């Protein structure tokens, strides 16, 4: 029997993000998930190695790679709709859960329990870091769009920056203080 899990995961590159906004450059959930994994790994390293608090960078990065996997089946629901009210938010969480279970069902039985925590993150510390990395990735997208002259992202940048600040996560605060402004630099300025 041919299992379809990885073939379906590879289709993440066809699911676009920011569907309600005019984009200077398109972003798909595969690209986004990679950036979230890089950021989650970095945040966890900051937490562990700089702030001397427990964190598992590898688990955070792995969970981040799959954090939007359910969208292969659901598509990317725009944030204003997803969080419009508590009922819609709850219903969408249920849809995501069903989607993740469907994805797990596409794996051989012996692999399902290994992938379950990646698709249904249950460790609150890992989930918090992945959530911060997800929001940080969204903010970086806004910064890049604004840098390209796309004012469409002004409100999203402002709201996302506020949401990041309100997370009160020390590793995120450290990242924002020491790394975030570099995303506004040109290639020549980065060297």
Question: Can you annotate each of these PLM segments?
Answer:
Residues 1-191:
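Alpha-helical, largely C-terminal catalytic domains
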């Amino acid at each position: 029997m041919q299992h379809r899990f990885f073939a379906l995961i590879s289709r993440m590159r066809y699911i676009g993000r920011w569907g309600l906004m005019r984009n200077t450059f398109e972003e798909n959930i595969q690209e986004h998930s990679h950036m979230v994994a890089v950021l989650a790994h970095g945040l966890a390293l900051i937490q562990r190695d700089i702030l001397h608090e427990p964190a598992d960078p590898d688990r955070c990065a792995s969970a981040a790679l799959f954090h939007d996997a359910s969208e292969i089946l659901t598509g990317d629901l725009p944030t204003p709709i997803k969080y419009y009210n508590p009922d819609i938010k709850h219903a969408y969480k249920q849809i995501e859960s069903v989607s993740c279970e469907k994805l797990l069902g596409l794996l051989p039985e012996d692999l399902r329990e290994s992938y379950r925590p990646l698709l249904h993150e249950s460790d609150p510390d890992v989930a918090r870091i992945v959530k911060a990395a997800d929001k940080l990735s969204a903010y970086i997208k806004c910064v890049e769009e604004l840098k390209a002259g796309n004012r469409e992202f002004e409100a999203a940048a402002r709201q996302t920056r506020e949401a990041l600040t309100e997370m009160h996560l020390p590793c995120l605060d450290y990242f924002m203080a020491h790394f975030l402004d570099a995303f506004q630099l040109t290639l020549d300025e980065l060297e």
